[in-house]
Amino acid sequence: MHIAILTLTFALPGCSSLKEKRQRMGGLHARFGNTPSVAVCESGERDRHDASEWTFVIVGLSKRDIESQCSQIEEKIERTVDARIMNVEREFV
């Protein structure tokens, strides 16, 4: 069993309220949290309206599968979330 922790930090240019932030970042938990091998939560910058940090914990039988899943998560977020990814960290436990 292999475990990866994927942390993404976002900038939300022009975002003026926490309500707007929820609308722009909304759905990350619903989109990825339903996958049995992925857990997701907003892990930082919770009180700032112009930034956000989300952490994904991915488990799998091989490191290769987990790396592939991390890449898929990043690509899907780039296509679907109205925010700019500022930093990506991958850690294997």
Where in the sequence are the language-model features?
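C-terminal binding/interaction regions
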Residues: 21
